[in-house]
A protein has these predicted regions:
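C-terminal segment of N-terminal export signals and the immediately downstream linker at the start
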Residues: 13-36
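Glycine-/small-residue-rich beta-strand-loop submotif within the FAD-binding core of flavoenzymes
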Residues: 94-122, 163, 167-168, 225-227, ...
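Short, structural beta-strand-to-alpha-helix junction motif
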Residues: 117-118, 125-135, 149-152, 338, ...
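FAD-binding subdomain of flavoenzyme oxidoreductases
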Residues: 144, 149-255
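Cofactor-binding catalytic cores of oxidoreductases
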Residues: 29-46, 85, 90-93, 235-540
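N-terminal export signals
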Residues: 1-19
Length: 540
């Protein structure tokens, strides 16, 4: 045993730098050790492949408590990792080297900061909590992700993709400030508030958190959001989501799906996005998912959401569906069984007009993979600048129809991208992917640890086959543009699986990586905050 049931961090940590901090008069953060009854719940995230055994789990509820936790760990030479929502796809939080986990789930406030004239969000707040609070209190939103329990700490620092991105951009496009606990060369932990103000001397720290990923620069303790150029009352400072949306979901049975049908479906989806991803068009508010499930699931599906208040919205949605599925001989039917992250939604085979918040809850809360306590998974990603080449489609079909592998929760999900996202220059934020039209998520979910090898191999085989012409990964070229940092994939580090001339950091960050390294050198010169794909110090 590592000690008492509960311990508390001692005082005496040095707090300095950045704006003055209010004196912390609260009690010290709770610390769990391995003899705590709650310990098992705090050493694992959503992916049960990764279970840690840290000496301590610290549960701060304020920035000063985070400063103290970081300072004590640094002073004692302990390896730190940080958790906000527990959705990291790799072992970057829970691994054998981690000795202290700083769990931010207790820092979950969402509100309006009158001094900064901006909305604030703490890192432990979840996507659904943030979306509901902003909308119910002020009628606004940020274009954050879909899965309800994802923590904002990592979601935002990785870019913050969401269902409204084609209309409003990425969440980081509305980020105006961030508070981060950093550790300088003097080994002192400090809370720094960095803003997007052009003359802010710490602006590089803000920029690093607009897509540089979590766990590289420090511990985020607060984000502030305000739409660029906005002024006025709080209800005018962030985008307003549509009052109502159309939600339409169909399934196509694999039993009726020939290879030409599959080719037409995937090709049409890509071609539609090539023609309809410029911002300012009539389809800005359309978001779709094309879920290409393994044939053992029995179906593929197309899910579409669109602003129902627009003139002719239902007709536009129906035209989209017709253009994607029109050349497919398989007869569309209701989606009456789950597909990975998507619950059955047979009631939406006919497009339903429903309130936006209700639709957001439906798509997020019903995710079966987030409620299975035994769920394990593996994931890969890609951005597409153009539609799917025939060689990619052929490789997808080969692996989705393999009979030597069976998993109804294995699939590739193509999601709409572009629109407002692509109006931002690649260097304006740390998120470089600003001319793509589709984002791909390769995924497999399973529960039996004995199936780890089979699932990981199947996903690797498919990914390697799809991108065989470019070294097994989606390098930045005229068709593909690298990978999404929030869909972490440690295989990109390995020369066995990445045979291209593009290292993992180039796939994630493109030309922005040297600038991220400079921010790393300034704000984490001792490399305190690190993991398998954290930003490296210059020269390393």
């Amino acid at each position: 045993m590592l000690g008492s049931l509960l311990t508390t961090l001692g005082t005496g940590a040095v707090v300095g730098g950045g704006p003055a901090q209010a004196e912390d008069t609260s009690s010290d953060a709770l610390v769990l050790t391995d003899d705590s009854a709650r310990y098992p719940d705090f050493v694992r995230g959503n992916n049960q492949r990764w279970v840690g055994r840290p000496e301590t789990v610290v549960l701060p509820q304020s920035t000063p408590q985070v400063v103290k936790a970081v300072q004590q760990a640094v002073s004692n030479g302990k390896r730190i990792s940080v958790r906000s929502g527990g959705h990291c796809y790799e072992d970057f939080v829970y691994n054998a080297e981690t000795q202290v986990v700083i769990d931010l789930s207790g820092m979950e406030s969402v509100g309006f900061d009158e001094k900064r004239d901006a909305f604030y969000v703490e890192p432990g707040a979840t996507v659904l909590n943030v979306v509901e609070t902003l909308y119910r209190k002020w009628g606004v939103t940020i274009p954050a992700g879909m899965c309800y329990s994802v923590g904002m700490g990592g979601h935002i620092s990785g870019g913050g993709w969401g269902l409204l991105c084609r209309e409003f951009g990425l969440t980081v496009d509305h980020l105006c400030a961030v508070e981060v606990v950093t550790v300088g060369a003097d080994q002192v932990a400090r809370a720094i508030v960095s803003t997007n103000a052009p003359r802010d001397p710490t602006r590089d720290l803000w920029w690093a958190h607009t897509g540089g990923g979590g766990g590289s620069f420090g511990v985020v303790t607060k984000y502030w959001f305000r739409a660029p150029g906005s002024h006025g009352t709080p209800d005018t400072l962030l985008p307003k989501p549509p009052a109502e949306v159309y939600l339409h979901v169909l399934a196509l049975p694999w039993a009726q799906m020939s290879q030409p049908d599959f080719t037409a479906l995937v090709r049409n989806y890509g071609r539609w996005h090539e023609a309809n991803s410029a911002h300012g068009g009539k389809y800005d508010s359309l978001m779709s998912f094309l879920a290409l499930g393994h044939q053992s699931n029995g179906q593929l599906s197309l899910m579409t959401q669109m602003d129902a208040t627009l003139p002719g919205a239902l007709d536009l949605l129906q035209r989209f569906v017709a253009e994607v599925t029109g050349e497919v001989s398989a007869v569309a039917r209701p989606m009456d069984r789950p597909m990975g992250e998507f619950a059955p939604m047979q009631d939406h085979f006919t497009a339903q007009r429903i309130p936006w918040l209700q639709a957001t809850r439906l798509l997020g809360v019903t995710n079966p993979t987030l409620t299975n306590p035994a769920m394990r998974g593996d994931f890969k990603s890609a951005y597409l600048r153009k539609g799917f080449p025939d060689t990619h489609i052929e490789a997808l079909f080969r692996h989705l129809t393999r009979t030597d592998f069976v998993n109804p929760n294995a699939m590739v999900v193509a999601s709409s991208y572009g629109g407002k996202v692509n109006t931002i220059e690649s260097a304006d934020t740390a998120t470089p992917h600003r001319d793509s039209i589709i984002k791909l998520l390769y995924q497999a979910y399973w529960s039996d640890p004995g199936q780890d090898t089979a699932n990981i191999k199947w996903l690797r085989d498919m990914y390697q086959d799809v991108y065989a012409a470019t070294g097994g990964v989606p390098v930045s070229n005229e068709v593909t543009d690298g990978c999404y940092i929030n869909y972490a994939d440690i295989d990109l580090n390995s020369p066995e699986f990445n045979r291209s001339s593009s290292p993992w950091w180039e796939l994630y960050f493109g030309a922005n990586y040297p600038r991220l390294q400079q921010a790393k050198a300034r704000w984490d010169p001792l490399n305190i905050f690190r993991h398998g794909q954290s930003v490296r110090l210059p020269g390393s």
